[in-house]
Regions:
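Intrinsic disorder/low-complexity polar-acidic segments
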Residues: 79, 85-314
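Feature for intrinsically disordered/low-complexity regulatory segments and propeptides
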Residues: 1-79
C-alpha cells in the first residue's frame, strides 16, 4: 500500500476547505460565439467576439475577444487554497467564505485566520482576514489583499493600500503558486504594522468638520464637500437635501456621532471605524437589492483612498 505524505504543514486544514466545495461559485461557465440580428431577421456572427454565460441560470457574465482565456472562479479558489497551503501561516480553524456578485461575474473569497490576532487600540481583538478576487468582467484583476475582522463589531477592517496588497495578476494562470506563498508569508508582520498606525490614529484628535470632510469624501457627498469649502457650519450642511438624501453619508455620520465618537473619542480611529462599519454593514435604502459583496469591496477601496489623507500624530 502506497502512502502519500504531503510536504505542506497546512495540507489537512486546506483539504478540509477543498472537501467543502466551491459554495456559490460552483457553476459552469459556457462560451458561445456572439450573434446579432440583421434588418431582414437573419442572424450574423460578430467577428472575434464570444459571450460567456452561466450554464445553470443562463445569466450573461461577459463578452470578450475570441482570444480571451477565461479563468473560472473554481480555478481562482483552487489557486488561493494552494497558496495558503504552501505558506507558513497558521491555518488552524481557518474559515473560508465564498460569495459571488454581479450574477456570478465576480467572486470574492475571504479567509479568516483566528490564530493571527491582535488587540486593537480600543481593547477589541481583530483577526487576520485575506481577500481573493476573481472577475469574469475584468472589473478587477485576480488579486489578494490583507485586512482584519474586528470581533466585537464584525467590521471588515481595511488596511492602507501599500500594506494591504499581497499580489495581483491578470489571471491565476499568471501567478506562480510558490511565489504567491512567499509573498503571503510576508504579511505575518502586516497586522502589527497596521495596528501601530491605528494606535497613532487613536492619539490624533480630529475636529467635526474634518471628520465630515473625510466621511463625505469616502461616501461621495460632493455637495457636503462644496459646502465645507465655503466654510458653512455643520448644522447648515446637514439641512441640505442633497446631503441628507445621501444614505451612505448619513449612515456613517450617524455611526460616528452616535456610537464610535462616544466610545473612542473624537479621533481618526473613530472616523475609520465608522467608515468600515459602513463598508461592511450598510445595505442602502433603495428598493432594488444591493449587490453586497461587490459593494463591500468597492467601499473598502474608497476607504483606502480616504485614509491616505489622515493626518497622523508623530
Amino acid at each position: 500500500m502506497n502512502t502519500v505524505v504531503s510536504l505542506f504543514k497546512n495540507n489537512s486544514d486546506i483539504d478540509n476547505l477543498r472537501d467543502s466545495g466551491y459554495g456559490s461559485a460552483a457553476f459552469e461557465v459556457i462560451k458561445t460565439p456572439m450573434y446579432f440580428r440583421t434588418a431582414d431577421g437573419s442572424s450574423k456572427e460578430v467577428a472575434n467576439k464570444d459571450m460567456y454565460f452561466r450554464a445553470d441560470t443562463g445569466d450573461q457574465l461577459a463578452v470578450h475577444s475570441s482570444k480571451y482565456k477565461m479563468v473560472t472562479h473554481q480555478s481562482m479558489i483552487d489557486t488561493a487554497r494552494k497558496v495558503l497551503e504552501r505558506s507558513q501561516l497558521n491555518l488552524k480553524d481557518i474559515k473560508e467564505t465564498i460569495a459571488v456578485g454581479d450574477s456570478g461575474g465576480v467572486c470574492f473569497v475571504r479567509h479568516q485566520l483566528p490564530n493571527h490576532q491582535i488587540e486593537t487600540p480600543d481593547g477589541d481583538t481583530a483577526i487576520m482576514e485575506l481577500l481573493h478576487i476573481n472577475s469574469h468582467t475584468s472589473v478587477w484583476p485576480y488579486q489578494a489583499t490583507a485586512g482584519a475582522n474586528q470581533n466585537a463589531c464584525t467590521n471588515h477592517q481595511v488596511f492602507l493600500g501599500e500594506i494591504a496588497a499581497i499580489y495581483k495578476a491578470r489571471h491565476t494562470q499568471s501567478l506562480d503558486v510558490d511565489r504567491g506563498a512567499n509573498l503571503m508569508n510576508k504579511i505575518m508582520g502586516v497586522m502589527d504594522e497596521q495596528n501601530n498606525i491605528w494606535g497613532r490614529w487613536k492619539n490624533t484628535n480630529v475636529g467635526l468638520k474634518e471628520a465630515v470632510r473625510h466621511i463625505a469624501t469616502a461616501t461621495g457627498s460632493k455637495v457636503a464637500l462644496d459646502l465645507l469649502d465655503k466654510d458653512e457650519d455643520f448644522s447648515s450642511i446637514m439641512e441640505v437635501p442633497a446631503v441628507y438624501n445621501n444614505s451612505s453619508f448619513m449612515y456613517v455620520m450617524a455611526k460616528y456621532m452616535g456610537h464610535y465618537q462616544k466610545k473612542m473619542g473624537s479621533n481618526y480611529w473613530a472616523v475609520y471605524n465608522a467608515l468600515t462599519d459602513w463598508a461592511t454593514h450598510h445595505t442602502g435604502t433603495r428598493s432594488n437589492t444591493i449587490d453586497l459583496p461587490i459593494s463591500q469591496v468597492k467601499r473598502s477601496e474608497k476607504i483606502q483612498q480616504t485614509i491616505r489623507n489622515f493626518s497622523i500624530a508623530s
